Design a protein with these regions (language model features):
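Glycine-aromatic-enriched surface loops/turns that form tight recognition elements
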Residues: 2, 6, 18, 30-116, ...
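Bacterial N-terminal signal peptides
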Residues: 12, 16-28
């Protein structure tokens, strides 16, 4: 009887994605420091710092924004910034898709499972066309930069490119290569 290799049961595309994911987990530590990505433990546990504000479809609770309509919760700050109880401190980091994946691993280890890059449709729900100069509700997402943010979605028309949503214009673009550095906002299902 011929021995079958483990990967023989999976299509080639699945093998590539699995190996890419495995490489990220085994890879050396991210150059992005974990403490620069996440809120401080005091900000997460101090009830006095937890604020609930209802704004349209969003409910804001400390470092999270809960999207009541779509059943997801967003990090209030961009990756690299830290929620201090009233705004986002620090510099939002522009990351490649590979480094964004490493930041997601850190977020899942420190804040619980499920954090990921948003889909194109999910990120587009944050666009506020009436808002200026940044096309997002700054009450819910303070200190957001008027720049593109990654989605986790490949452009089906140009498979070497990833979709982004630009919060300066409110438009979606599918022209960024995964090796380019773009801002990141994480989301997870509720």
């Amino acid at each position: 009887m011929r021995q079958m290799r483990f990967f023989a049961f999976f299509p080639a595309m699945t093998r590539r994605f699995f190996m890419a994911g495995l490489a990220l987990i085994v890879a050396e530590a991210s150059p992005v420091a974990a403490q620069d990505l996440m809120p401080t433990s005091a900000a997460l546990t101090d009830p006095a710092k937890q604020v609930i504000v209802k704004s349209g479809n969003f409910m804001v609770r400390d470092h999270l924004v809960i999207d009541l309509r779509n059943g997801v919760e967003w990090m209030r700050c961009s990756v690299g910034q830290v929620w201090n109880g009233s705004n986002c401190e620090g510099e939002a980091l522009q990351l490649t898709q590979e480094n964004a994946a490493k930041a997601i691993i850190i977020a899942n280890e420190q804040l619980g499972p499920g954090w990921r890059l948003p889909s194109r449709a999910e990120l587009e729900t944050l666009v506020c066309s009436e808002c200026a100069p940044v096309k997002i509700e700054l009450d819910s997402f303070p200190d957001t930069l008027a720049e593109p943010y990654w989605t986790g979605e490949i452009n089906g028309f140009a498979p070497r490119h990833i979709w982004t949503v630009n919060f300066m214009t409110g438009h979606t673009y599918g022209r960024f290569f995964p090796t380019q550095e773009v801002l990141v906002r994480l989301v997870r299902n509720r």
